[in-house]
Amino acid sequence: MSLMREMLEAGVHFGHQTRYWNPKMAPYIFGHRNKIHIINLEQTVAKYQEASKFVKQLVARGGNILFVGTKRAARELVATEAARCGMPYVDARWLGGMLTNFKTVKSSIKRLKDMEAMVADGGFERMTKKEGLLFQRELDKLNKSIGGIKDMNGLPDALFVIDVGYHKIAVAEAKVLGIPVVAVVDTNHSPDGIDHVIPGNDDSARAIALYAKGMADAVLEGREQNINGLVEEIGEGQEEFVEVQDNQA
């Protein structure tokens, strides 16, 4: 099935009501039907492919991308696809300073990992009932807020965002730090400040599943290229080493 057909079936072309539109999205709008803006899927396909290419190349160079989707319709889909491709994700509330104050976030990540290590060591079983309850409560809270980024050792090289209006703070923090943003932008939001705009419906679960799967696939393809490149480099290095040995012999 063609990408255009998949997008049609997922309802990617359905924007918001015309009265809520953002005029800056005009270049991506085909028209309107029943007071709903219809997004030009030719534009969406092209922009989606550009974004996928960017993600693939970024990962092929060893970069990582933070998936962000905290709306109810996006949470599970974003977490599942990010986990499938081994990338960090935020599926609960975006905590202010998650990027701009990463030092503090890192100390929370350390706390979470220490607590998980205690559980693995059986430390949890040695606690009193009250201690155990408080411990579990803190562990659950940390897991919910930063569980998806616990293996992120530094700032991400890019963000992939579903719904820029819902994640204004995440986009603003990335902008301050010069981190490129790939984002799904619906007809009621502004594409300003987004490096790779994917014009499309940001509410439909089927549409969100399509974007998230596509970006995860791009990550996996990029990683394969990265691994193949490293293997080739190692191979070339070994060949040179063998030649030197032969010359000495």
Swiss-Prot record:
Cross-referenced CDD domains: RPS2
Sorted UniProt keywords: Ribonucleoprotein, Ribosomal protein
Cross-referenced Pfam families: Ribosomal_S2 (PF00318)
One Gene Ontology cellular component annotation held by this UniProt entry: cytosolic small ribosomal subunit
Molecular function terms from GO: structural constituent of ribosome
GO biological process: translation
HAMAP family xrefs: Ribosomal_uS2_B
PANTHER family: 30S RIBOSOMAL PROTEIN S2 PROKARYOTIC AND ORGANELLAR (PTHR12534), SMALL RIBOSOMAL SUBUNIT PROTEIN US2M (PTHR12534:SF0)
Protein family: Belongs to the universal ribosomal protein uS2 family.
Protein name, entry field: Small ribosomal subunit protein uS2
Species lineage: Bacteria, Pseudomonadati, Pseudomonadota, Betaproteobacteria, Burkholderiales
